[in-house]
Structures are given as structure tokens and as C-alpha cells.
Amino acid sequence: MYAVVRLRGQVNVRYTIEDTMKMLRLHKVNHCVFLPENPHYKGMVQKVKDYVAYGKIDAKTLAEVLENRGRLEGDARLTEEYIRENTDYDSIKAFAEAVVEGKASLKDVPKLKPVFRLHPPRKGHAGIKRTVQQGGVLGNHEENINVLLHKMR
């Protein structure tokens, strides 16, 4: 499962890239979505790689984001009780592990908003104009996306 975080704004962005961002539901800076690994999403993420940070997320980080930033319709927080009552899982951590393994989907939680609004990272970005290979934060982080998401919790 991919975590994709928008890091750059929409000024001077080509229409096709902005359209792809809308399809991914990344309308604003510091918004995050979780996507399954398939060729369709992989191509879309590859197209917007110069405006986002992405990588493979682990269960611990997914549970942390769901607990801290998960919102239901009406801007209510996602709680352990809500997960227990509305899914087959006992906790957010168990649900996150099932999602990462592919046994469950975020759509299994009724009324869960698909976009997670994150804080800017603590201690700042390494630079939003450069890729990870050049010392910035844009592009494919692979497993290190978990560090960025922890900073943005």
C-alpha cells in the first residue's frame, strides 16, 4: 500500500498534473491518501512525482495516522470504539495491519474520509524543490515515507 502526500501547491502546475492530483484527491498541500499497489495508481503517482512524496507504508505508521488524523463525516474523530462497532476488528492497530496485508480496505470503515489532513513536518522539510536522491523530500521514499509521516502526525 502506498502513502502519497502532496507537498507543493497548485500555482504554475500543468493542467494534466493538477487533474491527476484531483483524481487522487490531493487538493491541498499536506493532504495524504493511501492507495493500493496496482498499475493504474502507480502510473498516476509516477505522473505527479515532482509534487508529492510517496512510498510503502507499514502497519504501525498507518495506525498512527488513522488514530491521530482519521476523521469521519461531520469531522468526528476515528476512535477504537467506532472501529470495534463498525468493523470486524478490535482496534485501530489490528485494522491497520489487515489493510497493509491487503485483507481489508479503508472503505470497510463506514463514513471514513479518504483524505487525511496532516500537519507540516516537525523540524521542517529537507526542501520541497528537490527529490529524495538530491537531498529533498519529493518523489519515492520507499520505506522512509514512514519517517516523514511520523514527522507530520
Curated annotation (Swiss-Prot):
Name one cellular component (GO) term. cytosolic large ribosomal subunit
The reply on keyword Ubl conjugation is no
Keywords, ordered alphabetically: Ribonucleoprotein, Ribosomal protein
Question: To which protein family does this belong?
Answer: Belongs to the universal ribosomal protein uL30 family.
**What is the top-level taxon of the source organism?**
Archaea
Q: How does it assemble?
A: Part of the 50S ribosomal subunit.
The protein's matches in Pfam families, at most eight in alphabetical order, are given as:
Ribosomal_L30
Question: Record's InterPro entries?
Answer: Ribo_uL30_ferredoxin-like_sf (IPR036919), Ribosomal_uL30 (IPR039699), Ribosomal_uL30_arc (IPR005997), Ribosomal_uL30_CS (IPR018038), Ribosomal_uL30_euk_arc (IPR035808), Ribosomal_uL30_ferredoxin-like (IPR016082)
**GO MF assignments:** RNA binding; structural constituent of ribosome
PANTHER family assigned: 60S RIBOSOMAL PROTEIN L7, LARGE RIBOSOMAL SUBUNIT PROTEIN UL30
Protein name per its UniProtKB record: Large ribosomal subunit protein uL30
Q: Which GO terms describe its biological process?
A: maturation of LSU-rRNA from tricistronic rRNA transcript (SSU-rRNA, 5.8S rRNA, LSU-rRNA); translation
This protein's species is Methanosarcina mazei (strain ATCC BAA-159 / DSM 3647 / Goe1 / Go1 / JCM 11833 / OCM 88)
